[in-house]
Amino acid sequence: MVKAILGYDIEPGMTVEEYERWLREEHLPDLKRIPGLRRVVFNTVKGIVRGETTFYRIAELHYDHMAAFERAAKWRAQNPVSFKRGPEGKTAFRFYVVCETEEIEFDV
């Protein structure tokens, strides 16, 4: 599995309520259209253990493999969303990385 992992804050001037409404009513339906995107996970940050960097949220976009991510990236470049629907002016990205995932489960 491959995950695109994004850390971000909400742009100044936008309330949490406005952001969440935009995210769920406009942005999520657009994400759902992306070929190969299997799952989206939102991790709302409640505290920082080390360092001073803060984030509103860490998001994960799940793909089956790197080729699926690359096809999705190409599709997104060919099918851009409008400014109103896209994250510009709403989402202040702090990082955006693509990771190959290894999950280890423990018996409890």
Predicted segments, located by residue:
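Macromolecular interaction modules
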Residues: 1-108
